């Protein structure tokens, strides 16, 4: 379908991205409606998806999305946790409405619901996990584009993009390339220059790993206590520098060979002890008059 137009043809750099992310790796089972997308079967039972069929369906989906005038009429959904980040990034890049996480029943059919929506197009990450959304879309005639594996049910799916919709890198790569092609068809970005958004931003990240990286970055950015550095660049006092430190006053010392002069005779008896004893009012040597017996 896209072989006649060089801009829409599959390029080598896109094939390298597909192979590095594992987009071509299917499951061990194959549905009857997905047999045309399988290239071959490996010895371990995993089916290989034909990447040329994947690219043709991806370009068809991008043309369908670009044909809608209002980007807000496109709804992208992912109940699978690995696709929530990719869905949010796709919606941020293209202006679509994201539904990441659990789908509330009645979003497309119950008009009295607070989050009631009437999109013109629905894009799903996995039709098996997003079965409720696809069922409601069939009630109100909303066309559905879905990333499908070899064993995915294609009921209520109008445009199936065969790929590995279970891997983190595969889901992120598919949503990234789909967003890039939509922006190319809308004329927002040029095909001559590469898109400045990296595919890694569409990959799922564990919140615990993000918190650990933030803590490590905070510790690395904190400045350690620097040791004391003496300032040797200060000006020296010229008056002190010009002084002769050798001209010190001579202090005459004492004659240590002379006999020490005794000013007091410590062997003499001290005088006045009797006066001190008479000053005491009581006589401690006097026997007691009280008979305790």
Swiss-Prot record:
Residues 219-293 are annotated as: Disordered. One of its GO terms (molecular function) is structural constituent of ribosome. GO terms for biological process: ribosomal small subunit assembly; translation. One of its GO terms (cellular component) is cytosolic small ribosomal subunit. It comes from the Eukaryota. Required for the assembly and/or stability of the 40S ribosomal subunit. Required for the processing of the 20S rRNA-precursor to mature 18S rRNA in a late step of the maturation of 40S ribosomal subunits. This is Small ribosomal subunit protein uS2. The lineage of its organism: Eukaryota, Metazoa, Cnidaria, Hydrozoa, Hydroidolina.
């Amino acid at each position: 379908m896209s072989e006649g137009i060089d801009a829409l043809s599959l390029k080598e750099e896109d094939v390298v991205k597909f192979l590095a992310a594992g987009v071509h790796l299917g499951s061990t089972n194959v549905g009857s409606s997905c047999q045309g997308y399988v290239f071959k079967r490996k010895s371990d039972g995993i089916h290989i998806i034909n990447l040329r069929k994947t690219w043709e369906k991806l370009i068809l989906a991008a043309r369908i999305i670009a044909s809608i005038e209002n980007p807000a009429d496109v709804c992208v959904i992912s109940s699978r946790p690995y696709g929530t980040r990719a869905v949010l990034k796709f919606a941020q890049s293209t202006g679509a409405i994201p539904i990441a996480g659990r789908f509330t029943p009645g979003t497309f059919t119950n008009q009295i619901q607070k989050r009631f929506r009437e999109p013109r197009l629905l894009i799903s990450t996995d039709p098996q996990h997003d079965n409720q959304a696809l069922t409601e879309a069939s009630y109100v005639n909303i066309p559905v584009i879905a990333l499908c594996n070899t064993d995915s049910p294609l009921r209520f799916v109008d445009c199936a993009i065969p790929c590995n919709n279970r891997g983190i890198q595969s889901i992120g790569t598919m949503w990234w390339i789909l967003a890039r092609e939509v922006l190319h068809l809308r004329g927002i970005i040029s095909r001559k220059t590469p898109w400045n958004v990296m595919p890694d931003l569409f990959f799922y990240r564990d919140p615990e790993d993000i918190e650990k990286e933030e803590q490590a970055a905070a510790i690395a950015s904190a400045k350690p206590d620097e040791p004391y550095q003496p300032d040797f660049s200060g000006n020296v006092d010229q008056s002190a520098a010009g002084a002769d430190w050798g001209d010190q006053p001579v202090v005459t010392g004492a004659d240590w060979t002379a006999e020490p002069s005794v000013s007091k005779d410590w062997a003499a008896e001290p005088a006045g002890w009797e006066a001190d004893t008479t000053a005491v009012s009581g006589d401690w040597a006097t026997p007691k008059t009280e008979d305790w017996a």
